[in-house]
């Protein structure tokens, strides 16, 4: 009874704090509250509080159940939210270099934890005895590595999606300006005097705004470079976790089912996801094709991760069906 009450309290504390943090980020984006001393730093400290709250929640379920809390979908979602809070700690303790991770990790943590604690999972499952298929020392190794890999890959993929959005906004007006120039050439014979006046006026405006335009383009370039850098770093880390998780799962499968690989739906999608991010890392080694191309591959991997993570859980089939919605 005490553990249930403590778990309930820690769940609400972590969710409330991360909700406040997300609100602070949203207000900062709207009204530029960075100028207020200490306001933005308090949001970072809020994620640290959330990290310890989720950590306490996981330890409470661990002590109460007697096994590592990764036996169902609810516990895996809480652990995934914990993984995002760990990634956020990187930006918190690395203040020398601004990396924009907090804009990705805070909304992701609140979305995942909100989904886990909502009524979409029917109810929050109580800690129970493991099913025979999960009673193994490989549970902590395999599932934790997979979830940590999912968290890092999702975060890196979201950074790549942000890179694509910023790049699209950068190149979009360029094509629009080219079309304007073409239309001006068509009408130049009829409105030469008017165009001459407009061009003279525009040249003055361009001289006045040249410094502002240069600083804005330079900031956008720096932002794209940072997003590309951190996307590569985090996806590389997630790829290592995913590889270790797949290999440990293969060893566990051989001990339980007598074969290393069975082409189970979860295994198949995990292999597809691993292949996509292997292609991403290969593209990053080629200076001629990296950039937007690698970001597109990472964005594709973002969808594949959710298919791999929730696909079997929605269908409730295969050897991994014990973590499905129906089992909760």
Curated annotation (Swiss-Prot):
Function: Required during biogenesis of c-type cytochromes (cytochrome c6 and cytochrome f) at the step of heme attachment.
Species, as recorded: Arabis hirsuta (Hairy rock-cress)
Sample GO molecular function, one term: heme binding
One GO-annotated biological process of the protein: cytochrome complex assembly
Subcellular location as annotated: Plastid, Chloroplast thylakoid membrane
The protein, known as: Cytochrome c biogenesis protein CcsA
Membrane-crossing residue ranges in chain numbering: 13-33, 46-66, 73-93, 101-121, 146-166, 234-254, 263-283, 295-315
Similarity field: Belongs to the CcmF/CycK/Ccl1/NrfE/CcsA family.
UniProt entry keywords in alphabetical sequence: Chloroplast, Cytochrome c-type biogenesis, Membrane, Plastid, Thylakoid, Transmembrane, Transmembrane helix
Subunit structure: May interact with Ccs1.
Main location class: plastid
GO CC annotation, single: chloroplast thylakoid membrane
Residues making up the signal peptide according to the UniProt record: none
InterPro entries (UniProt xref): Cyt_c_assembly, Cyt_c_biogenesis_CcsA, Cyt_c_biogenesis_CcsA/CcmC
Membrane topology label: Multi-pass membrane protein
